[in-house]
């Protein structure tokens, strides 16, 4: 599921969100790879990945994958008011 959200008060800056909650790691990582490819090709500055809180297993898999994906400048957990440890914010190079 892709959801468009605006970041801050600047309407020109937008983040796009991929919701991976409830998916198995292999399925989630396949979707994540395709999603990141499309986001990079479209010139996005960054995206949000929703992996949920739960046990943290999916978050760990997503973070391990992001460490190896080319084109990513950084990633970090979202501030608590934006999803906290259930959301990872990715910034592209």
PLM region descriptions:
Residues 1-93:
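Long, charged, low-complexity intrinsically disordered regions
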């Amino acid at each position: 599921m892709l959801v468009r959200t605006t970041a801050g008060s600047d309407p020109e800056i937008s983040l796009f969100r991929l919701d991976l909650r409830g998916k198995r790691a292999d399925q989630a990582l396949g979707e994540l790879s395709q999603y990141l490819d499309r986001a990079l090709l479209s010139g996005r500055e960054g995206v949000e990945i929703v992996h949920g809180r739960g046990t943290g297993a999916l978050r760990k898999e997503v973070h391990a994958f992001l460490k190896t994906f080319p084109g990513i400048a950084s990633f970090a957990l979202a501030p608590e008011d934006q999803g906290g440890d259930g959301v990872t914010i990715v910034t592209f190079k």
